[in-house]
């Protein structure tokens, strides 16, 4: 703490990111990165940007990427916002759309950055308890609010809210912005982007860090009504007009255009997930239904924190959350078959 800090800084509780170990020998199953590399076509496109044009600023609007996203989802570029990772996109959403008199609503078990943003921007919030199956109860969100946000599939549980239920939540909150955080949607869910033309209060966020294997590039997006997008553009241009570099814009656009590679890698992750679920269940683990590139599991005879520590000693890193209701679960990223086997060997 320093006497030069602004007063609010001392009360901030920052987000704690997953460990990025320096040792290459570790099997990394803790931060939900894709075990398969980016699209070769995207890599080639990015290499093409590494030239003298780097002396020039990138397109502040990211139009090439917006067009690719719009074509992929059947929307217009005016309905698309792009930013430096979905975390930055979410930060702009909290800043630009959730600062109202009523509290913001989100699940008690969800992305741990949400309360951090609320603290940063002075937003009142209420964490609404998921049911015993870790699902949202629509009735719990039928009350005054400044907005609603939730991850779908949920993080860290991996549980999916069906699109019909998402629409029911939208219908019950026509006077509030509803943000569906779809970081993991491509691994088993149906995107809510199909609803944006019917609901002017819907905003859907996605990332290229998971299903498109570009976590190191930092690219995120939002799709919604042009009026909501305009609010984000105003915040962005009051903060950083150039959030995406030249290589990121082109590489992310090509990642959307290369559908064949995208579908192939998603299928491999999904297939590996289903195999690993069965293998863990055979070892006595309870595994929650997952539509993500990770699973949430617990063993009735093993303390989760101790198990995570023992796995790390054997070179396998998984994620353990010390918080109510889920302290006995481990979140395990789906790796290649070889990485998953290393986990199973360590458990044995």
From Swiss-Prot:
Top-level EC class as recorded in UniProt: transferase
Gene Ontology biological process: L-histidine biosynthetic process
Coiled-coil segments: none
Modification type N6-(pyridoxal phosphate)lysine: residues: 210
MF (Gene Ontology): histidinol-phosphate transaminase activity; pyridoxal phosphate binding
Co-factor requirement: pyridoxal 5'-phosphate
Similarity section: Belongs to the class-II pyridoxal-phosphate-dependent aminotransferase family. Histidinol-phosphate aminotransferase subfamily.
PANTHER family: HISTIDINOL-PHOSPHATE AMINOTRANSFERASE (PTHR43643:SF3), HISTIDINOL-PHOSPHATE AMINOTRANSFERASE 2 (PTHR43643)
Assembly behavior: Homodimer.
Stated name of the protein: Histidinol-phosphate aminotransferase
């Amino acid at each position: 703490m320093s006497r030069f800090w602004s007063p609010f800084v001392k009360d901030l509780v920052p987000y704690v990111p997953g460990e990025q170990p320096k040792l290459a020998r570790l099997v990394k199953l803790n931060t939900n990165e894709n075990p398969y590399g980016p699209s070769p076509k995207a890599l080639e496109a990015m290499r093409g940007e590494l030239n003298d044009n780097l002396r020039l600023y990138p397109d502040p609007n990211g139009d090439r990427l917006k067009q690719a996203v719009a074509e992929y989802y059947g929307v217009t570029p005016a309905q698309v916002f792009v930013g430096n990772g979905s975390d930055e996109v979410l930060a702009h959403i909290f800043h630009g759309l959730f600062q109202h008199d009523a509290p913001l609503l989100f699940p008690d078990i969800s992305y741990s950055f949400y309360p951090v943003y609320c603290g940063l921007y002075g937003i009142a919030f209420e964490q609404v308890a998921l049911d015993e199956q870790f699902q949202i109860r629509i009735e719990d969100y039928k009350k005054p609010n400044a907005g609603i946000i939730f991850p779908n599939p949920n993080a860290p549980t991996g549980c999916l809210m069906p699109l019909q239920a998402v629409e029911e939540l939208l219908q019950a909150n026509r006077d509030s912005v509803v943000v569906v955080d779809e970081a993991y949607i491509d691994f088993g869910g149906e995107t809510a982007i199909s609803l944006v033309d019917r609901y002017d209060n819907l905003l859907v966020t996605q990332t290229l860090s998971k299903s498109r294997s570009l976590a190191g590039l930092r690219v995120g997006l939002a799709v919604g009504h042009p009026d909501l997008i305009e609010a984000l553009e105003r915040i962005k241009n009051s903060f950083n007009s150039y959030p995406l570099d030249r290589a990121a814009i082109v590489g992310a656009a090509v990642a959307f255009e290369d559908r064949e590679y995208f579908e192939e890698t998603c299928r491999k992750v999904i297939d590996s997930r289903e195999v690993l679920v069965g293998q863990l269940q055979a070892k006595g683990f309870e595994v929650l239904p997952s539509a993500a590139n990770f699973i949430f599991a617990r063993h009735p005879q093993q303390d989760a924190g101790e198990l995570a520590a023992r796995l790390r000693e054997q070179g396998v890193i998984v994620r353990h959350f010390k918080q109510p209701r889920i302290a006995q679960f481990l979140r395990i990223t789906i790796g290649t078959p070889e990485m998953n086997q290393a986990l199973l060997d360590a458990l044995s």
